[in-house]
Structures are given as structure tokens and as C-alpha cells.
Amino acid sequence: MKRQTLALIGLLIVASLFPISEKVEVKVSVKHPVVVQTKATMEQKRANKKMADTFARVGFGWDKRQRACVHLIFTKESRYDHLAKNQQGSSAYGIAQMLGEKSTDPATQILRAFHYIEQRYGTPCAAWRHHRKGWY
């Protein structure tokens, strides 16, 4: 990878970690076309699944049964694709297809989904029971 590309990637990572509220003009000269990723790769999906399982086990203390329910929900919603867009036309986005989700960061999406599940349903399996009826 060329230095300019690496520098641009570094700039984008820093900008996503430290958002600013004022407008900043950035001029970038790109000689090669920029490829915008619209779907997660299988490798990314596997990493997202592993991250979700780790967060559920370590961060939330959910047992194997609860983690299986997380897997059912995330598989049905997006197959762990953090770039998934809702096929029904709503603004739902990401791994858990949450409304209003703006982050493309899988860790942020997973944590927001887990907090939502915990606050609204108590456990992932309670969320899954509700989800089977349609929405969650």
C-alpha cells in the first residue's frame, strides 16, 4: 500500500475516533479510484461474530444459552454484516439492524444492541422470543 493511501486511512481512522463539530476542509489528491465497501467480507463477519460472543460472555456475563440467542438475532438481522442496510426500506442499519444507527464500527453496533436488549428485554433469549413474532 502506498504511503498516501496509508496516510489517508490513518486520517480517516483518527477522524472517526475524534469527531469535531466544526467544518474542516480537507483536500485529497487521489490518483487511483476509491473503492467504497458496501458489504462485509466473510472474514469481517467471522470477526464480528467472535467479538459479539466475547462481549456477551465477558462484558455482560451471558451464558452459552443467551449467547446462542444473540447469534440467532444477529444472524437473522444481518448475518453479522456491520454494513448491512435494511431491505424493507427503513433506516435500520448494521449488525442488529437498529434504527438510527450511524456507526459503521462493529464494536459500537454490538454494544449498542446489547444495551438495548438488556434494557428492553432483560436477556437475549427474551428478545429472541419477541423477535420471532416480528420486531425486537
Where are these predicted regions, by residue range?
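Intrinsically disordered, low-complexity
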Residues: 1-68, 126, 133-136
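Peptidoglycan cell-wall recognition and remodeling modules
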Residues: 45-136
